[in-house]
Amino acid sequence: MKYQVEVCIDNIESLHNAIAGGATRIELCSSLALGGLTPSAGLMYSAGRVSPIPAYAMIRPREGDFFYHDDELSIMAQDIRTAHQANLQGVVLGLLNADGTIDVKRSKPLIELAHSLGLGVTFHRAFDHCVNPEHALEEIIALGCERILTSGLARNAYLGIERLAQLVKQSAGRISIMAGAGINAQNVAEIALATGVNELHLSAKTTRPSEMLFIRSESKMGAADCDDFIIPVTSRDALQQTVHALAALNSVLH
C-alpha cells in the first residue's frame, strides 16, 4: 500500500519544508491556529509555481462554524476560481446545516464549480461536527468528493481509531478516508494499521524564533497569549520521521 501524506501549511517556508520532508500533497491554508482558513491569493500563486506535488487550497472564509450565508458562498466560489487560476490541483471545503447535517444544497454548486475547473475536492473536518456520520458519508460520496478529512469525530485521530475504521469499512473504496488531527511519527503506524486508511494528514508543526534584532515587547499584534516573535513552521525532520514510520510499516506489510 502506498501511503499519501498530506501536510497542512500556512506560509511559504512551511511549503518548502513540507516538500523537503516527503509530503505527497499540500493543504494550503492561512491561520492554522484557527483550524485553517483560505490562503491568500499570493500564497496560492506561489504554491502553484513552486510545488512539485499537488496542492489543495482550503476554502474557509472565516473562523468558527461551518454554517454559511449567501455572501460567504460567493466568497468561497471566487476563492475556488482563484485556486484554479493559481494552477492548484484541488480545494478543501465543508458546509453544514444548522442541525448538523451536511448542507448538500449549498455544497453542490461549489463542488460542481470545482469539478468544472478540473479541481479535486476534499471534504474537511466539518464532517467531525455532523450529527450522523454514517449518513453524512453517503451524502459526501454522492456529492463527488475525493476524500473526507476526519479525526473519527474525536479530539484526535488516535482517539478516533475505532470510528475511522468503521468509516473506512463503510466507504468500501468509494471515497478515501484521510485521518487527521494529532498525527505524528510515534502514532502514525498504529493509526494506519488499525484503521486501514492510506491517507494521513498532519502539520508536523514546530516553531522558530524571529530574526528581528529589535523587539518592542509592549506592542502586541494579536491575542495577548500570542508571541509575535515566534514563527510557527512545518518541521522537515518531524515530517521525515513520520514518512519513515509509514515506510517501515509498508515494508513489514509487504
Curated annotation (Swiss-Prot):
Keywords on record: Cytoplasm
Transmembrane domains' residue ranges: none
A GO term, aspect molecular function: copper ion binding
InterPro entries: CutC-like, CutC-like_dom_sf
GO cellular component: cytoplasm
Location within or outside the cell: Cytoplasm
Keyword RNA-binding attached: no
Domain of life (superkingdom): Bacteria
Main location: cytoplasm
Classification via HAMAP family: CutC
Family designation: Belongs to the CutC family.
Entry-linked PANTHER family: COPPER HOMEOSTASIS PROTEIN CUTC, COPPER HOMEOSTASIS PROTEIN CUTC HOMOLOG
Protein name: PF03932 family protein CutC
Species, as recorded: Vibrio cholerae serotype O1 (strain ATCC 39315 / El Tor Inaba N16961)
